Amino acid sequence: EATSALDVSVQESVIELLVRLQKEKNICMIFICHDLALIRSFAHQIAVMYLGHIVETIPGEDVSDHAVHPYTKALVGAQFSVHMDPTKKIESIESEAPSPLDVPVGCPFQNRCEHCMEQCKKEMPELKEIAPGHEVACFYVDGMKKQTKGGR
């Protein structure tokens, strides 16, 4: 997490440097960070991980409006902004995360997911494309997509 302990102005300088190097050298970068708002500001593609598993990949510009995995949606809902509606509830995930040394069988997010089904406790969902550049690993989302016969 290259920017986690930095002052916001220094953080901005580091991001600007990385973006400039990326363009000048025509390189791809993997940037690991817990600050979704920061990542969204410059990332072309975002991969959201939970307990070491990628649960959603999504274009950076789409993460706030089109995230569908329950964990990604919780991350988006937990973001605070001074510009946000003061009546809007900041989301939180109620239960504790399991130990990364003892990840449950099936979906790693199952014990914290309000949409957990029996299938989630038995099988690991695979990433499936739901829109161009957007993949999600979630049986609940699979079921919703089948019900609505399409993505967004």
Regions from the PLM with identified roles:
Residues 58-152:
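Charged, flexible cofactor/metal-binding loops and thiol motifs
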Residues 1-88:
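P-loop NTP-binding/switch modules centered on Walker-like glycine-rich loops
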